[in-house]
């Protein structure tokens, strides 16, 4: 394969990961109370957190040696279409979002809901960026993308990868 990405591409990929890490660290390690609590449900939040962690572990297991923190495929990586990848193209992102929603729900803090929304927006952009490289690297990716939902395992809506 020709050169995978430019330095600018790699810097943008690293920026996506850094912003993601900052949001997750704020969700996990901050506990700021503004005296307003919305939808604080400890046990449902904990259940969502656990489901998110399980999803991350299952997703990581499905891609094993192809796992990378950057939204750029590994040079010798393989296209994953089994396990949770059979149901959604980005189960790792979905699982992290479920975990993040759990953190927001269990705390009830409005800023954590805003961080969750920010993370969801970040993953929408990050996945679009990542899919450009996946489509270049794997011949079958476009077909897989057209048959498999991006984040939520619902009946397929028409979406075309360019």
Predicted regions and their residues:
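Histidine-centered phosphotransfer motif of kinases
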Residues: 86-94
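Membrane-anchoring alpha-helices and their flanking helix-loop junctions
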Residues: 1-81, 98-162
